Amino acid sequence: MSERKKTKIVATLGPSTDSPLIIKKMILEGVDVFRINFSHADHSEVENRIKIIREVSEKLQSNTSILADLQGPKLRIGKVEDGISLEPGDLITFQNGETFIGDRQKVYMNYKNFSKDVKPGERVLLDDGKLIFEVISTDKKSIVEAKVIQGGSLKSKKGVNLPNTKLSLPALTEKDVIDAEFAIKQNVDWVALSFVRNSNDIMDLKNLIDQHTVHKIPIIAKIEKPEAIENIDKIISYCDGLMVARGDLGVEIPPAEVPLIQKELVKLAKKARIPVIIATQMMESMIDCLTASRAEVNDVANSVMDGADAVMLSGETSVGKYPVEVIQTMSSIIHSVEHSELITVPQKPPNIRTVRFVTKSICYHAVHIANDVQAKAICTLTNSGYTAFQVSAWRPNSHILVFTSNKRILTQLNLIWGVKAFFYDSFESTDKTVEQINKIAKDKGYVDKGDLLVNLTAMPIIDKGMVNTLRVSIV
């Protein structure tokens, strides 16, 4: 039986990944999901990249997943004169309306409600927190006066963060709506929503998806605002997955607080049995260098040991010099640590009697039985993918092999920890079905003759209902 990694790798598309050969090599080295960053995406380019991925994935029979990452509300200043340096105590005016070239006294702000939303005493962060300002006054129309707290070089088009301010800007912008509609037409597998603040943001995107397709496209909430941390329980109840977006999160809150927040978010995601992705600056030195720093190796390893479903690469693969090598390195780190006994696995069984209580309980006990008898695989039949999420969350030692006649979820499930999905549509009888899927597991190299498997099915099998049966088989 070959050893396969269970923690998934998400790689961001870009100029460095435009070649079908590079895409093929990346998949073979361990990429499970390709991310489209709509902050830097031309629709015709994206369409071509998706076409390449699907063609390569089909040839490799890899079920590679596609994640559309919406930009969200990006606040920026306008162009400024060259060579401006600000010192602590300097005063500066932020102004919206007609665009202009800024100087050391006044800069353009692209957010029209900036002066209405901010209040005196709140902080304005510029250029990933390199410059910090405190709001002195606002006319509530177009002008905000601020004082420099932390100075530095003032550069054009830099991003703005408002950690203390409740923005009236929706999480789903006009650009996001256009990009989301395009992504839906492309049949992407997941959509990530940036700068989520509350559950209403998730519902807005859900409603948009429902208006344009009858198929479920799961939503990942990107956690990068203090408001999201405050509302995390409600957000989790509405979304289908989390992304710990440490870049903006580490600007909006003190960076020293991010590690514990990351661990807490992973823990909450596992409790809700939804996937969680750790993102941003994981192996950033490999954009230009063939080797990762020791700190980066530790970061990836610790994210895996925290229990992340996936670890994500951004610039490393989109614009980096070594998109294939960085996947090799990340896969190597995952293989080295993901079977460590130091990793803690959630143990508390489901106790809320919902409609799916029986299925949840069977999935929980299937994992414990599989670990107990040292089964090499848990094989489950599913039409919605629900049992895959449930089994994965309990982190079994065995492979999780999912068999489905629903082609839509084959690629969606490629994001989920430990899951490998196969198309299967022959539902004659329970005995025949179990025999056939066990043979597929053996033929694909996941089990050998004499190995034990745990089979999860719904009886009667032709109804494709909720899982209600657990069975231990010998290959």
Language model regions located:
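Non-catalytic helical/linker scaffolds that mediate oligomerization, partner binding
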Residues: 1-475
